[in-house]
Amino acid sequence: VIRLGKLHEQFGTYEMNGIGFQDVNEIWWLESIGGHHWIAKRVPDDEVVVMPNQQGIDYFDLCDAFGEQKEHLCSQDLLSFITENHLDLTLNEERDVPLAKDTVFDCRLAFGSHDDADHTYNTPRAWFMLRYLAPFSYKWEGPDAIFRPEDDDLPWSLVPDRKVTVEDVKYLLSSHYQGTPYDPYGRGSEAQKGKYRPIGINRTNFVALTQLRPYMPPEKMAVEWIAEGCNVYNAFVPFYANVDRTPEYLSQTGELPDTHEFYWANRLIGALADSHHAATASAIERYQNAVAAKGRALLQEGDKADLPADGVSEALAQWNDKIASMAQEETQKALGKVLYEASNGMKNSFARSDA
């Protein structure tokens, strides 16, 4: 985090951006705030962060950032940057401490965007994810809701109502406002359906999750969960990360569509299933559940298997090959089922009984 911050101060950037850092002990989130300025905050151990495409860190402890730096870091000139550009939007009567001693400085208010576009593109996605993660801790809907889809003060992080699983992450990154009037596949009014940008959107190429498992030996600790194509219809596959090569099913993606490649097979599944969402829903759900269950089973086998003294990476790569073979088999079966339903639903279908 500090190294990237120093590079940022030296070279700068032309846009705001964010990046997460993690090891087995902690997670930090760094945000560039334009030019040569940056902030970073340690994610509390019992909290989750929800980050759409906008500046996200809300409350920032400037006292810690310029003091012990236990949970907050920033560029050295941040205080002068705030002061010289009049970015402290706290009302004078509310500011009872010097800026350098402020423990709850609102970075999102000072540096972030609050555009109308955010209220269709960003805040609704954060609202849906936070609503899923903490459904009982806050009121999310109705006239007495604490947080609504277009609010600018949605929390950057919160304590979820329960522990978060890999499957939860996949569901959220595939979501399209299920159970709300805003679901483009749902039964809401035309004015509400498609009102907000879904999280699982058609142009997604891949999604990944890095899982660090402290209960495993170091060589097997890191697992990368990968899905390719549109998240609504694809499946999460686990792979050992401590390897020097990737299974050909994933690594040999060409420019032309090919059903023998994970990416293209999933792109085809998504394109076919989208127009027949209800008819293919069962096949998609079975596909996603089968890959997740069989992937976990193979991962558990690999976790228990002995590794050679030499060639650890290749041994784990061979387990990845087994997992990729399973994923290919399940993907081909899903493609066949989706193609069958889509073919039956073509507009030029006709039966003798229709005459």
Task: Cite the ranges covered by each PLM segment.
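C-terminus-biased signal that marks the final domain/tail of proteins
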Residues: 12, 16-17, 24-27, 56-355
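Catalytic or ion-translocation cores adjacent to nucleophile or general acid/base/metal-coordination motifs
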Residues: 2, 42-60
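Coil-to-beta-strand transition motifs
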Residues: 35, 46-47, 216
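Gly/Pro-rich turn-and-neighbor structural signature
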Residues: 2-36
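Structured soluble/peripheral alpha/beta segments that form catalytic or ligand/cofactor-binding pockets
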Residues: 26-30, 37-40, 49, 59
